[in-house]
Amino acid sequence: MLQDIMNTKKIKLHDCHFGSPLCDPSPAPHLLSSAAAAGLSFHPGLVSSAAQHQQHGAGGWLHEEYYAPRSSPPSSLLAQTCVGSNATAFYAAENLPQFDFPALGTAAAAAAKAPFRSSESELYRPVDPLLLRADHSVRTYYVRPQKRDSGERTPLPPPSQQQHQDRIHGLFAGAPTTRLLSGEPKIHLFPPQVAAKPILPAMDAPSLQNQMENQLTRNCIGAATPVTPTGNLAGSGAPSKTRIRWTQDLHERFVDCVNQLGGADKATPKGILKLMNSDGLTIYHIKSHLQKYRIAKYMPASSEGKQLEKRATGNDMQNLDPKTGMQITEALRVQLDVQRRLHEQLEIQRNLQLRIEEQGKRLQKMFEDQLKASRSVMEPQELDDVVAFAAGDGDDDAFDDVDVQLLAVAGSGYDDAGFQSKIS
């Protein structure tokens, strides 16, 4: 039973929860007496803590602002959170009149039907810092039951304080974006006695809160700035380039304007734009189209043919299988070898032809020199031959006469010798 009572007084508080109620661990005196009458017993440490609280007073405890619930949660939900006890025992031990427990009396049931309002003085509850754990993830606090009259209607907090409370609730109610973008400062409300004392470790989470707020601010700012198609921010004022399609009619007008201005070399984008006078065209469109027009006009046809041939050859090579490709490579290698040998033979023939020509020139020169030498030798000999021939004509006549006479003498002498010829 003691374990059940202790379990009902434990509340787990996480660092990220800012507005959880923190209460004084000292139980109310009338609860101690009522619990003793009912047969319940409290832990000695809890009773000593209550006595210490009565001696020192409530001014020495740290406080944290919280908001009392206006509507009671379902009894089944709270009963499930209390380990080892039912809902009736939990409500009776804590003296919470906003929940129904008719088994303990009709006065508490009547108080549960009345609307619950927390006064300004009840917004702060003392907490014993010595009972806080060193662990920053989960902390356990001992809650003191609240003492109030069943039929008393407490006044609502002042409007200004209610506005501050609603504003702080808005910080953690899922709408931090509007507050951060509007530039509203962060507000933390604490009672005056908290300012002079060290803050609880559970409340020392503004650093985590600031990180979350900064991240939300960056996300909101990044989502609120649209980006243009050119990559510039919408508020930068940079002109966005629109794309147009150059139809045949538009291109013909462009060519006419270029010809009027003296050709593609002399035409300027500004002059073409002025002559065309077409809606939607800008100087950037004219510059780009004029550059393409110049490139297409002055590109050599041979280079285009070579490019087309190379592309066709590349496509054909891609369509061939590896075996055929190897055969073609081998044939090309053989052809290169033949061409190399032909080139070597042509070079040898050329060198031989040059040598033959040089030798012919030398022979021609030798013949000319020989003719000159022979002419110089033959001229005096010819003169001698002419003189000798002229002198030899007279001698021949004398020799002829002598020969005739000798023949005559010989003939007569033969006849006289008695050798007569026999003629039949």
Curated annotation (Swiss-Prot):
Signal peptide (UniProt feature, chain positions): none
Keyword line: Activator, Brassinosteroid biosynthesis, Brassinosteroid signaling pathway, Coiled coil, DNA-binding, Lipid biosynthesis, Lipid metabolism, Nucleus, Steroid biosynthesis, Transcription, Transcription regulation
Record's keyword annotation contains Nucleus: yes
Subcellular location: Nucleus
Molecular function, one GO term: DNA binding
Keyword flag Lipid metabolism: yes
A Pfam match: Myb_DNA-binding
Source species, domain of life: Eukaryota
Region (Disordered): 144-165
Entry GO terms, CC: nucleus
DNA-binding region: 269-294
Domain HTH myb-type, first and last residues per copy: 238-298
Broad class of where this protein is predominantly found: nucleus
Coiled coil: 342-391
BP-aspect Gene Ontology terms: brassinosteroid biosynthetic process; brassinosteroid mediated signaling pathway
Segments carrying motif LHEQLE: 342-347
Family: Belongs to the MYB-CC family.
Function: Transcription factor binding to specific DNA sequences of target genes promoters, such as the motif R1BS 5'-NAKATNCN-3' and the motif P1BS 5'-GNATATNC-3' to trigger their expression. Nitrate-induced component involved in modulating phosphate (Pi) response and homeostasis together with PHR2; activates directly the expression of Pi starvation-induced (PSI) genes upon nitrate disponibility, thus triggering the nitrate-induced phosphate response (NIPR) promoting Pi uptake activity.
Subunit structure: Homodimer. Interacts with PHR2 in the nucleus. Interacts with SPX1 and SPX2 in the nucleus; these interactions prevent binding to the promoters of target genes, thus regulating negatively leaf inclination in response to phosphate (Pi) starvation.
Name assigned to this protein: Myb family transcription factor RLI1
Lineage: Eukaryota, Viridiplantae, Streptophyta, Embryophyta, Tracheophyta
